[in-house]
Structures are given as structure tokens and as C-alpha cells.
Amino acid sequence: MYAIIATGGKQYKVAEGDIIKVEKLGVEAGATVSFDQVLVLNNGQVVVGNPTVAGASVSATVVEEGKNKKVIVYRYKRKSGYHKKNGHRQSYTKVKIDKINA
């Protein structure tokens, strides 16, 4: 059994027991979260939502929150001497999928 959920502007294919990184949710570790935007549900039979599957949700437990590795953004224009260096670390929340409610 698997489901495709949408959170943080991205889509994730999840099954029970999976651990995934999603965009920061702002919830402390150990808390339970529910994802209600289930786009596709497969429990032996594929159900595609329009745009979401009615009555379906995915419950998960927050494992940790953190930041990804730093990404360096470097802008450069030749001949003029212009250059600019920026760094960015995106925050994430790691969750463990507990149950897919159909």
C-alpha cells in the first residue's frame, strides 16, 4: 500500500514505515502530523483524486528538524569586477509515516 501526498509544494510517494524529509513544518520532535492532501492512493486498487482523494489522510510522527547542507550561490559579471557570493541552508523536517488512512 502506498500513497502520493503533497506538502510544501512538492509531492512524495510514501508507504507505512518510510522516513522522508519534507519542508519545515514548525512542529517539535515527537509530535504527530497529518497530511490531508492525498493525490493518489493504492491499496490493491489505484484511486486517483480530483485533485485529492476524499476522506484519505496520512498520519506521521516528527523525527527531527534540521538544516540541509549549505548551497553556495555565486554571481559574476566579467570585465566589470562584479561578483557576489551567498550561502543558503534550507530547513527541513524529517517524518516517519505511521499509517495511511483510506
Curated annotation (Swiss-Prot):
An example Gene Ontology CC term for this record: ribonucleoprotein complex
GO MF term set: rRNA binding; structural constituent of ribosome
Keywords, ordered alphabetically: Ribonucleoprotein, Ribosomal protein, RNA-binding, rRNA-binding
Similarity comment: family membership: Belongs to the bacterial ribosomal protein bL21 family.
NCBIfam families in the record: L21
Function: This protein binds to 23S rRNA in the presence of protein L20.
Protein's recorded name: Large ribosomal subunit protein bL21
Annotated source species: Lachnoclostridium phytofermentans (strain ATCC 700394 / DSM 18823 / ISDg)
